[in-house]
């Protein structure tokens, strides 16, 4: 088995690095308080039940806009959603590459934001959503205008998805 990183993925990593240097590092430098020892306080509105501060959310939105405009945010999504049909292998390598760069606006795993979006909920909506749901939510989920949550925990297994006992049966279309 060949464990070498495919050339096209290596080239894409170089493209990402150039984008980060050109677009993200300057933006992050203007907002250091969100990435150093002050980050929890800077990101959190303690007077509003600990919700994220609007300024932090706005910075994440700007990062997503820039990444989307450059063609990175939707990398793993199907072409019909503006993506590049990125593979699981490519995503694993990209995520590892970005994480290795450390804490930053390019990839903040604390709140699952990244210049290369990880969108399992978008894939699910694209595959199983009704036309009305897709029209309302798909693009908004990608851009961060809408958030989606799902329940994973069960009484006997917590959040270990490998032990889920809940099942579903398709009933209708």
Where are these regions (language model features)?
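Glycine-rich, Trp-frequent "lid" loop and neighboring beta-strands that shape
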Residues: 83-84, 128-173
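N-terminal glycine-rich flavin-associated loop
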Residues: 109-132, 158
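Short alpha-helix boundary/capping motifs
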Residues: 48, 122-123, 153
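Amphipathic, small/basic residue-rich leader segments at the start of a protein or domain
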Residues: 1-112, 132-143
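Short beta-strands and strand-loop turn motifs
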Residues: 75-77, 115-118, 149
């Amino acid at each position: 088995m060949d464990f070498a990183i495919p050339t096209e993925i290596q080239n894409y990593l170089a493209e990402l690095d150039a984008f980060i240097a050109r677009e993200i590092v300057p933006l992050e430098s203007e907002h250091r308080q969100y990435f150093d020892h002050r980050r929890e306080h800077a990101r959190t509105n303690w007077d509003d039940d600990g919700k994220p501060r609007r300024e932090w959310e706005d910075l994440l939105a700007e990062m997503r806009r820039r990444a989307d405009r450059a063609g990175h945010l939707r990398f793993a999504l199907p072409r019909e959603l503006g993506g590049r049909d990125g593979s699981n292998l490519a995503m694993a390598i990209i995520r590892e590459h970005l994480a290795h760069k450390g804490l930053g606006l390019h990839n903040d795993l604390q709140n699952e934001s990244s210049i290369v979006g990880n969108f399992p909920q978008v894939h699910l909506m694209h595959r199983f959503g009704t036309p009305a749901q897709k029209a309302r939510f798909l693009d908004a989920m990608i851009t961060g205008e809408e958030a989606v949550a799902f329940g994973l925990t069960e009484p006997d297994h917590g959040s270990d998805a490998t032990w889920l006992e809940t099942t579903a049966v398709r009933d209708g279309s």
